[in-house]
Amino acid sequence: MKSTCRSASRPARHARRGRRAATAPYHHGALREAMLEAAERILERDGIAGLTLRAAAREAGVSHAAPKNHFGDVRGLLSELAALGFTRFSAALVANARECETTKARLAAIGHGYVTFAQQNPGLFLLMFRGERLDFRRPALRAAGEAAFEVLADAIGWHGPSETPLTLSVAARITAAWSLVHGFAMLMLDGRLKPLVARMPDGNDEMTLLGAILGGPTPEM
């Protein structure tokens, strides 16, 4: 089957920066960025249970009061980190499907981008969909989440502002596509696909399995 997309290069893992010395001063904006970077390192290393304001301050090498001044509480920190995740997530999906010529190819490329992002950023991905830990009243998170949804909606050929009413047919198509790739990503992160992949011919993995499900070309990894 001839691809109608150019193979997207594998997204680079977000650079992990070393811990900054406690004595190093921060500009106001740089401090916020440093706190988010520290929070992401903790999230990927220790999981959401290990991410507290005190732990983030210690990781960034700043006073314990610093994260509270910027984010209010741990829910605020998690929400801003999730917003950053959704922004990077949307960019990865758009980049993956940029050269696609058909709706089917776009959906396949976005599906691969969706699962690849989850595979490379498991802690951040899980946080982004932990609604009970996030505050969607925060403008940054609400806007970033809506933008990610619009990427998926656009892939099936629906265009319009986020508050535009959807027909049942369009809503069903968006939900079907979203459920497929999100469910696959969750099964993969939980390790539930490993026994299935182990029974497949050599040279196959979760991504080739996803390609077979989506019916599109599997990008080079």
Where do the language-model regions lie?
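Short hydrophobic/aromatic patch on the recognition helix
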Residues: 61-71
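Short linear capping/connector segments at secondary-structure termini
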Residues: 95, 128-135, 194-195
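An amphipathic alpha-helix adjacent to DNA-recognition modules
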Residues: 29-37, 44, 49-50, 70-94, ...
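Intrinsic, short, N-terminal disordered tails of RNA polymerase sigma-factor systems
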Residues: 1-3, 7-10, 156-157, 187, ...
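Hydrophobic/aromatic-rich alpha-helical bundle segments in the mid-to-C-terminal region
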Residues: 136-142, 146, 159-211, 220-221
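Hydrophobic alpha-helical connector segments
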Residues: 94-124, 145, 167, 173-177
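Amphipathic alpha-helical linker/stalk segments
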Residues: 84-107, 139-147, 160-163
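Basic, helix-initiating cap at the start of DNA-binding domains
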Residues: 1-46, 54-55, 59, 76-79
